[in-house]
């Protein structure tokens, strides 16, 4: 029992805490105190009435029960409201009592509400305890608790479940209804309900229980009892099992055992009497639930014995005990449930039915035996049962009460319910007590009868009961004062002046309506605490009070309600001592109380404050309660204060944390800003340096220009060197290969470029040009395909102006950089070179700004065409009709006008291909820009070399007529500005016209102007005449198949004649690479420079930077120089000399953008014989003598893509190669063979390709560095793979580089 008491205390603590959390309860209590006086009167009346009722015979009890039922019906209803308002409050306990009665009436509904309330109370109360959880859950475990009640589903639901929520109630209703249950309705029937309110409730409960078990009460009971018989199964099983569960729940281990035992007893008890068995069930359940199942059980056993005899006693006892223990709604539930089963039995005849019902027969037999004493006995046992639960409570409160039980059994049934209620008071106890009370009315009568029989057992029970009684009273008071529910429970069950207390309760409920809910959690816990603490004390106090005078008690208790509730725990022991005296009063009080309770339950529901008043009245029982309550309140206040202080502290701490975070955040921001500023400063310095570098480079290219007289190679080499040196860093960074070094005058270079271009499979389509140009230009055009375009976008085809001077070659290495090398070559190649200086700046964003440098003398102005090349800068310089390496380059040879009309398009394939469309039209007059087309008169040779993508400078001045815009289409990148394309197209069309007119062979450089006009109209207007280069001698040199038509080579102009200047633009550094032109005239950016038709080969080598290509900036400046093409030589510049755009696809897409080499080699002087194309055809691959059979399943090694880059520090060339896409079907590569080809003016033969080394295959991409080259020479490199079977794969597209240019450029 002590153990039970402790759990109760726990519950008390929980409630106390809740109450503390909600101060409203205290206020309500205070308000209630005001009403205490009134409550006192009512309590006195109620007490008296209770006393009367208590004595009343079972019949009267039945009346009370009926009354209660009615009241309960109302109560149930009220409680339902209350339940909703304060389902969890103690009031529910009262409602339970009421519910029991009502449940008899409503049974399920009433019980449900009241039980719900009760359970709610319990749950609130008990949950703290833990048992409550089980209890309420008992209730709560609806099945468990009420199930303990034997109404697991039903009663418990009704009673407990309500707690569980209305679910219980619903369940109850449902179960009860479902059960319909006579059990459900059993109250009436069971009440026989008359059996007793308790019984009736149990009835209702039982029905509920019954329901759970089965529709029919008897069956339920039987089943229940059976279950009970099952012991834990018993009523508990039915609902009883839940009880068991609850018991288990409450105190699973003991509970169950106890439960089982109680169950057995309960079975007996249930069978014995409706109320009793319900109680009994409850008891078992309660017992099991009870922390002191043993004790409880012991009591139960006694009770059970008695209870079995009386049938209900044990259940009641257990029930009460559990209730007390658990406070435990479980107990209460059990009690209720027990009664329910009993009631079911009552309905079916508590004893007989139960016995008939099931195994319970045994128990019934026992119960009947014990019960057999009579239903009165049952009632008694019910009472006893309740007492026992009370006893349990008492036990919980004090194990001492058992002795007193005997005497008080008769009373105790009533008192016990009251006590039980008190025990329940937390919610649970009240609930139980109310249930008990309901049972009690019947029980009391029966109890009285049984009292003697069961007195022995009940002595113990009585003690418990007494304590329970006190407990119940206290819980009632608590319910009244602390919690509406608790007060209501108290007042109803425990307070004799139930009516008064009920009024108070009603008031309280009304006043606490909302608070009650709030308080129900807070108050209930507090109440539970109070109840638990006070149960014994209150019981004692109340008993004393009752013995003395209820009014007296009521008033003092009312006054002390809150304090009492808190102090009750302490008083419990005294209360327990008093219970014997109180039992009688309790009984009477209970009978009336219950009766009144049913009425008051309703009121209480509405009146929260009244509950408190009632509670207070009860508390008054002890004088020291005030002090205790004060202490408790003080403690609560301290707790609250501490909580507030903690909250303030937390808030302050949070604010501080926020401030600290803000400060830290600011620090971080400052640090980041500082970092960014430092970075910006560094970048600014770099950009400044880059710009200076560009200026220097641009300035330097003009200086290098060699007099036109100089051999093209020298000039080219010088220019290339200069550019290369400037660009070498970029080259290194980008590991681009330089495009052909100083273009050898001979077309060989163009040829080589062509081959590479063809390899690139330039999409360039040269309209019939190729044949017209026999000169290397056609061969060079093939280079147009700028597969490696990734970088190729930067490729600018430099047109060599046939000026007789060396052709400048412009190598644009940086992919990102689109070099517009307007080769405005006056007769001197220098101009071209300086024009080549025009670079297309690539913005890192990937937009390529093409500065078209018009090589045409007329248009020297460079136009910047922003080309947005996402991945690669596509040089879309419409500017030069020079050969667009990837796209067809139209070169008009003097012989064919149409080819001139064609535009070269350099498209940068998304991968690496940039196709430069340069329309080279030698249209003398057509200048899209409105620049007058070059004077075709110049030389028929005038060739328009559209400098591919970049070179706005038409490759030759003659290119100006080509006005080919180099449209670099990034097919992959997709985008050269459409405007550029359009311009290119326009220029192309115009150039086409011009070329047709020029077809005589004269290509006007003016086309360049036109072109520049399209790209950059303003500058294009440079002297047209100079631009004219006679393309009459087209080199029919076949373009590499890939290369679209070869640019027309002026028929008379041999490439060799003009020196070829190569400009290498390396995009490595963001700075722009200056393309050095050696224009005779200074290169003015954007200046239309009359181009002396010099045969300059402009070789644009775009080496894709291995890394992102740094866009070249400041490219424009050179363009003017290029532009300045002065037709120095009356000789028409034979730009037409075949300009070869060598687009090297050697770069693998994966690696840095492929380098695009556009060799535009216009024939030097028209008279010069066409140069041989370079490089010579690659050597044939030897076939292995014999292949192993497995080789048949594999294909030849893939064709590598080669990229060249210059090593600035040493005169070295870096060869890097990879494959565009890995072909899994190829055999494993064993080694790579490197071949080099030194370009010489002499004839080209395959034997000139020398194998320079063999490298064991490693994972691609691979690279190797070659050194020790003869400066001033142009080298071509090719790589092919050899697989493990000795088979050779195809050569990569040959890539060329000008060794000299790097030395010069430095």
Curated annotation (Swiss-Prot):
PANTHER family with a match to the protein in the record: ACTIVATING TRANSCRIPTION FACTOR 7 INTERACTING PROTEIN, ACTIVATING TRANSCRIPTION FACTOR 7-INTERACTING PROTEIN 1
Residues covered by region (Interaction with MBD1): 1190-1306
Position of the Glycyl lysine isopeptide (Lys-Gly) (interchain with G-Cter in SUMO2) cross-link: 33, 592, 944, 974
Comp. bias intervals (Low complexity): 185-212, 246-261, 284-303, 987-1000, 1022-1040
Skewed-composition ranges (Polar residues): 109-134, 143-162, 513-523, 713-722, 948-981
Name of this protein: Activating transcription factor 7-interacting protein 1
Keyword tags: Acetylation, Activator, Coiled coil, Isopeptide bond, Nucleus, Phosphoprotein, Repeat, Repressor, Transcription, Transcription regulation, Ubl conjugation
Residue ranges occupied by any Fibronectin type-III domain in the UniProt entry: 1054-1143, 1196-1302
Coiled coil: 666-696
Segments of this protein annotated with the region Disordered: 1-23, 104-470, 496-604, 689-722, 765-785, 871-895, 920-1060, 1152-1196
Location within or outside the cell: Nucleus
Main location: nucleus
Modified residues (N-acetylmethionine): 1
Pro residues bias locations: 871-884, 1170-1187
Function: Recruiter that couples transcriptional factors to general transcription apparatus and thereby modulates transcription regulation and chromatin formation. Can both act as an activator or a repressor depending on the context. Required for HUSH-mediated heterochromatin formation and gene silencing. Mediates MBD1-dependent transcriptional repression, probably by recruiting complexes containing SETDB1. Stabilizes SETDB1, is required to stimulate histone methyltransferase activity of SETDB1 and facilitates the conversion of dimethylated to trimethylated H3 'Lys-9' (H3K9me3).
GO CC aspect terms: cytosol; nuclear body; nucleoplasm; nucleus; transcription regulator complex
Sample GO molecular function, one term: transcription corepressor activity
């Amino acid at each position: 029992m002590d153990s039970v008491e402790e759990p109760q205390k726990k519950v008390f603590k929980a409630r106390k805490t809740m109450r503390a959390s909600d101060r409203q309860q205290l206020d309500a209590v205070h308000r209630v105190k005001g009403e205490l006086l009134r409550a006192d009167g009512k309590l006195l009346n109620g007490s008296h009435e209770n006393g009367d009722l208590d004595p009343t015979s079972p019949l009267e009890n039945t009346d009370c029960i009926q009354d209660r039922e009615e009241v309960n019906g109302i109560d149930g209803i009220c409680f339902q409201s209350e339940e909703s308002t304060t389902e969890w409050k103690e009031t529910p306990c009262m409602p339970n009592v009421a519910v029991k009665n009502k449940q008899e009436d409503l049974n399920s509904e009433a019980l449900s509400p009241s039980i719900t309330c009760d359970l709610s109370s319990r749950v609130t109360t008990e949950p703290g305890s833990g048992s409550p959880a089980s209890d309420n859950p008992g209730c709560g475990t609806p099945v468990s608790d009420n199930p303990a009640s034997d109404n697991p589903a039903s009663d418990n639901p009704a009673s407990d479940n309500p707690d569980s929520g209305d679910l219980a109630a619903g369940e109850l209703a449902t179960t009860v209804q479902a059960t319909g249950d006579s059990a459900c309705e059993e109250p009436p029937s069971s009440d026989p309900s008359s059996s007793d309110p308790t019984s009736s409730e149990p009835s209702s409960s039982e029905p509920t229980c019954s329901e759970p078990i089965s529709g029919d009460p008897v069956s339920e009971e039987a089943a229940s009892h059976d279950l009970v018989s099952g012991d834990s199964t018993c009523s508990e099983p039915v609902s009883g099992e839940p009880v068991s569960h609850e018991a288990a729940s409450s105190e699973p281990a003991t509970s169950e055992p106890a439960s089982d035992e109680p169950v057995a007893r309960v079975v007996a008890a249930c069978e014995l009497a409706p109320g009793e068995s319900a109680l009994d069930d409850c008891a078992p359940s309660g017992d099991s639930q009870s922390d002191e199942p043993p004790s409880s059980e012991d009591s139960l056993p006694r009770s059970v014995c008695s209870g079995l005899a009386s049938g209900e006693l044990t259940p009641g006892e257990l029930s009460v005990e559990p209730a007390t223990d658990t406070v435990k709604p479980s107990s209460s539930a059990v009690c209720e449930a027990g009664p329910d089963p009993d009631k079911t039995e009552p309905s079916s005849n508590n004893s007989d039915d139960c016995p008939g019902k099931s195994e319970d027969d045994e128990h019934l037999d026992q119960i009947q035996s014990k019960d057999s004493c009579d239903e009165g006995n049952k009632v008694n046992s019910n009472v006893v049962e309740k007492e026992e639960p009370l006893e349990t409570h008492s036990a919980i409160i004090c194990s001492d009460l058992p002795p007193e039980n005997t005497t008080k059994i008769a009373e105790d049934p009533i008192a016990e319910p009251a006590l039980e209620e008190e025990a329940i008071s937390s919610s649970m106890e009240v609930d139980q007590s109310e249930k008990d009370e309901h049972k009690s009315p019947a029980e009391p009568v029966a109890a009285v009868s049984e009292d003697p029989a069961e007195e022995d057992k009940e002595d113990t029970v009585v003690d418990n009961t007494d304590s329970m009684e006190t407990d119940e009273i206290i819980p009632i008071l608590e319910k009244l004062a602390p919690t509406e529910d608790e007060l209501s429970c108290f007042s109803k069950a425990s307070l004799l002046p139930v009516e008064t207390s009920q009024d108070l309760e009603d008031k309280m409920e009304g006043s606490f309506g909302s608070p009650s809910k709030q308080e129900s959690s807070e108050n209930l816990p507090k109440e539970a605490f109070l109840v638990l603490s006070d149960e014994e004390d209150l019981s004692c106090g109340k008993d004393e009070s009752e013995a003395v005078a209820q009014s007296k008690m009521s008033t003092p208790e009312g006054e002390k309600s809150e304090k009492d509730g808190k102090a009750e725990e302490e008083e419990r022991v005294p209360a327990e001592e008093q219970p014997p005296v109180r039992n009688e009063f309790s009984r009477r009080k209970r009978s009336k109380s219950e009766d009144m309770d049913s009425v008051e339950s309703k009121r209480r529901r509405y009146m929260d404050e009244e509950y408190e008043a009632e509670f207070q009245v009860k508390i008054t029982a002890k004088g020291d309660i005030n002090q205790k309550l004060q202490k408790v309140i003080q403690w609560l206040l301290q707790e609250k204060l501490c909580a507030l202080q903690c909250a303030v502290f937390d808030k302050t701490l949070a604010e501080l944390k926020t401030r600290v975070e803000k400060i830290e955040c600011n620090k971080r921001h400052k640090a980041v800003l500082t970092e960014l500023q430092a970075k910006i400063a560094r970048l600014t310095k770099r950009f400044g340096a880059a710009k200076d570098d560009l200026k220097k480079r641009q300035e330097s290219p003009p200086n290098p220009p060699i007099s036109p007289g100089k051999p093209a190679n020298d000039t080219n080499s010088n220019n290339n060197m200069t550019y290369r040196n400037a660009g070498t860093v970029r080259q290194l960074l980008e590991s681009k290969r330089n495009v052909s070094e100083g273009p050898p005058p001979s077309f060989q270079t163009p040829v080589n470029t062509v081959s590479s271009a063809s390899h690139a499979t330039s999409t360039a389509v040269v309209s019939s040009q190729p044949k017209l140009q026999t000169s290397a230009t056609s061969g060079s055009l093939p280079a147009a395909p700028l597969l490696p375009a990734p970088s190729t976008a930067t490729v600018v085809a430099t047109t060599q102006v046939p000026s007789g001077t060396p052709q400048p070659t412009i190598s644009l290495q940086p992919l990102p950089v689109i070099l517009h090398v307007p080769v405005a070559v006056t007769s001197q190649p220098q101009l071209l070179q300086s024009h080549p200086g025009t670079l297309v700046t690539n913005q890192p964003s990937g937009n390529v700004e093409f500065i078209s440098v018009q090589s045409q003398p007329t248009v020297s102005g460079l136009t910047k065409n922003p080309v947005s090349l996402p991945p690669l800068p596509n040089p879309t310089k419409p500017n030069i009709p020079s050969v667009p390496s990837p796209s067809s380059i139209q070169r008009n040879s003097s012989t064919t006008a149409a080819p001139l009309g064609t535009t070269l398009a350099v498209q940068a394939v998304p991968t690496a291909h940039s196709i430069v469309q340069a329309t080279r039209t030698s249209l003398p007059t057509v200048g899209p820009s409105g620049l007058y087309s070059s004077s075709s008169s110049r030389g028929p040779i005038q060739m328009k070399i559209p400098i591919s993508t970049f070179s706005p400078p038409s490759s030759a001045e003659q290119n100006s007529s080509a006005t080919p815009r180099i449209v670099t289409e990034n097919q992959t990148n997709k985008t050269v500005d459409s405007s550029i394309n359009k311009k290119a197209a326009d220029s192309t069309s115009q150039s086409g016209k011009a070329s047709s007119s020029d077809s005589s062979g004269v290509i006007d450089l003016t086309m360049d102007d036109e072109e520049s006009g399209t790209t950059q109209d303003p500058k294009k207007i440079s002297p047209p005449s100079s631009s004219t280069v006679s393309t009459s001698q087209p080199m029919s040199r076949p373009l590499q198949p890939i290369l679209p038509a070869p640019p027309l080579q002026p028929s008379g102009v041999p490439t060799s004649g003009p020196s070829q200047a190569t400009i290498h633009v390396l995009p490595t550094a963001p700075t722009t690479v200056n393309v050095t032109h050696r224009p005779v005239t200074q290169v003015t950016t954007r200046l239309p420079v009359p181009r002396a038709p010099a045969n300059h080969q402009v070789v644009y080598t775009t080496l894709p930077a291995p890394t992102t290509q740094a866009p070249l900036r400041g490219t424009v400046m050179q363009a003017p120089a290029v532009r300045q093409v002065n037709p120095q030589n009356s000789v028409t510049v034979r730009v037409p000399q075949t300009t070869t755009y060598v687009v090297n696809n050697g770069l693998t897409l994966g690696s840095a953008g492929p380098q695009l080499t556009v060799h535009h080699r216009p024939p030097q002087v028209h008279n010069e014989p066409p140069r041989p194309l370079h490089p010579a055809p690659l050597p044939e691959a030897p076939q292995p003598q014999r292949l192993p059979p497995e080789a048949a399943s594999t294909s030849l090694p893939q064709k590598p893509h080669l990229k060249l880059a210059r090593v600035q520090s040493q005169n070295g060339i870096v060869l890097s190669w990879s494959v565009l896409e890995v072909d899994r079907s190829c055999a494993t590569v064993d080694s790579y063979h490197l071949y080099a080809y030194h370009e010489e003016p002499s004839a080209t033969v395959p034997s000139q390709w020398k194998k320079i080394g063999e490298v064991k295959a490693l994972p691609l991409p691979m690279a190797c560095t070659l050194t020790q080259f003869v400066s001033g020479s142009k080298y071509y490199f090719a790589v092919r793979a050899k697989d493990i079977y000795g088979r050779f794969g195809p050569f990569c597209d040959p890539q060329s580089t000008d060794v000299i240019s790097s030395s010069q450029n430095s």
